[in-house]
Amino acid sequence: MISSTLLGILSKFTPKEFKEFGEFVKSPFFNKNIHVKHLYDYLKKFYPEFKDKKLDKEVVFENLFEGKKYNDGFLRTVIYNLGKLAEDYLAYVNFRKDDLNRGINLLKELNKRKLEKVFLKYYSEIEEDI
């Protein structure tokens, strides 16, 4: 069976989050691994329950890599990478919701890059929000 950790995270996504996670997975900025994209596409057929015999690792491998000899280590790596993306997505969603911390992080980065004018502009905006 596919990793219960990965399926546990995915099963808790709302339909909107699951769809958005698919966009996250397919974004070349966040993921360049085509196998991870294919695994997401395969798993979405089973959302949200993820209870099916077709989730056995050998069956998943056969569907993703038709005609190739089963390689547990390779499949586990693909599953692990999708799991890491799910964790990154959750962190990203949380980051987007927290305007204050997002602003503080932006200020740190602007300051580090010595972008004083832009820093002062955003500093004033953030100060007003506090």
Where are these regions (language model features)?
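Flexible inter-repeat linkers and adjacent short helices
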Residues: 1-130
